[in-house]
């Protein structure tokens, strides 16, 4: 770090603490905001403060929200019969960006009795008919799916999980064996 520039060094350190930001990028960002574009720097500081103060988890699903209920849970146009279970609010952002799903969500960031009871109450309250699991593929997620299926088998639900396989534009030589195996075993007719 540069001696005599404590504020600059603190800013660099703050940027470097963010995911995927290394020291060189942190220095570039700090320099840009302090020297090249101070107005954007002040705007960024204001936006960060507002986001930290006003964004919280939706009380129903756990998505990012500025209100008790997020826009998704409040939207009357959404299909209220299906519930997609995800691992984090970031997953909701990704699915929403894809515009491939129009139902509700539930963030299952940890598997405990409190979360399971909350999930059950939402299923009963909203008369959910299908649970879609959109979890990272792993042995743990498979066990979680099996556990939830078993726990809620008496609720007359359909259970499904998102398809897995080979991403678009990826050569077979670059695909891991588990994904390749799943893609072959769960292939679809054309």
Swiss-Prot record:
Record keywords, A-Z: DNA damage, DNA recombination, DNA repair, Metal-binding, Zinc, Zinc-finger
Zinc finger (C4-type): 58-73
One protein family per Pfam: Toprim_4
TM annotation in the entry: none
PROSITE patterns with a match to the protein in the record: RECR (PS01300), TOPRIM (PS50880)
Chain ranges of the Toprim domain: 81-167
GO molecular function: DNA binding; zinc ion binding
Function: May play a role in DNA repair. It seems to be involved in an RecBC-independent recombinational process of DNA repair. It may act with RecF and RecO.
UniProt xrefs under HAMAP family: RecR (MF_00017)
Identification of the protein by name: Recombination protein RecR
Organism listed in the record: Campylobacter jejuni subsp. jejuni serotype O:23/36 (strain 81-176)
UniProt lineage: Bacteria, Pseudomonadati, Campylobacterota, Epsilonproteobacteria, Campylobacterales
Gene: recR
């Amino acid at each position: 770090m540069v001696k005599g520039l404590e504020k600059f060094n603190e800013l660099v350190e703050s940027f470097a603490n963010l995911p995927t930001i290394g020291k060189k990028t942190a220095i570039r960002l700090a320099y840009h905001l302090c020297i090249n574009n101070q107005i954007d720097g002040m705007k960024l500081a204001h936006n960060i403060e507002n986001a930290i103060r006003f964004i919280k988890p939706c009380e129903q699903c756990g998505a990012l929200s500025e209100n008790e209920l997020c826009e998704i849970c409040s939207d009357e146009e959404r299909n209220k019969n299906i519930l997609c279970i995800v691992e984090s609010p970031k997953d909701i952002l990704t699915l929403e960006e894809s515009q491939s799903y129009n139902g509700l969500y539930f963030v299952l960031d940890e598997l405990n009795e409190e979360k399971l009871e909350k999930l059950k109450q939402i299923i009963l309250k909203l008369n959910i008919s299908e649970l879609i699991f959109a979890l990272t593929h792993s042995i743990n997620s498979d066990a979680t799916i099996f556990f939830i299926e078993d726990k809620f088998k008496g609720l007359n639900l359909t259970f499904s999980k998102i398809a897995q396989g080979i991403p678009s534009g990826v050569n077979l030589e670059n695909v891991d064996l588990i994904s390749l195996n799943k893609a072959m075993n769960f292939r679809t007719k054309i």
